[in-house]
Amino acid sequence: MPYQDLIVGHKSMKNPDVIEFAGDYSLRDMLLINHEGEAIDIKYLVQEINVYESIYNNSITGTVVITDATNLINNLPIQGTERLAFKLKTPGTDKQQHIIDCSEKTGFPVNIFKLTHRQQLDEGVQMYILHFCSREFLRNMRTRVSKSYSGTLDTMVNAILGDKDGLDSRKTITTQKTRNSDKIVIPNKRPFDAVDMLCKRAMADNSKSVGYHFYETTKGYQFRSWESMCVDDKGIKR
């Protein structure tokens, strides 16, 4: 996986079940939800969606390019507390690995944290870019971990991510078991920094290697050894 992997790009315009160009996607709907819970479907304002994930980033991020002839951002001002709920897939397939689910019913909506590149295209028409991130990214900026943990490092990671008073992640967390147990004091660190600290100490249960990666994909969080990322699905080294 490259440093920053672009997951999707341009919306499939003609036939939502046929791929015409690389990066095409089929978008079911896209709801912009404000802090009061009011939702507006902005699907037809969307020109482009970009979702980024990386083994070097603890959270997914993304952008939505909007062409707005409805005066949306004045009628529903962007204050940094809004959420985006959407579900998109690769045209022509319903396989789970080709679906990005950020819907309210079955997935996890993302949070808008910035609006940039606002420009007037025509009278009554403007374009701008909405920047979004996962909910945990914002909670990580607002919370700290000051606590001692004991046991295997993979259980510590699960405890840090699921702490109701901290990161409070509800997403799938896939952890590779570690063979080393320890008692560790986290000295007032942000949750992601605490997990990154554990990554440097973690030793895989089924190998002699040291060092883990912690990152988020569109399917959830991963805490796994470097060595496990260098094998194929059958466990054979590449």
Stretches with model-predicted labels:
Residues 46, 157, 195-198:
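A generic alpha-helix structural signal
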Residues 125-139, 150-173:
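Glycine-rich, acidic and aromatic/proline-enriched surface loops and short helix-turn segments
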Residues 127-130, 134-136, 174-238:
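Short beta-strand-centered interaction patches in the first periplasmic/extracellular domains
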Residues 141-150, 180-186:
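Second-shell loop/turn segments in exported
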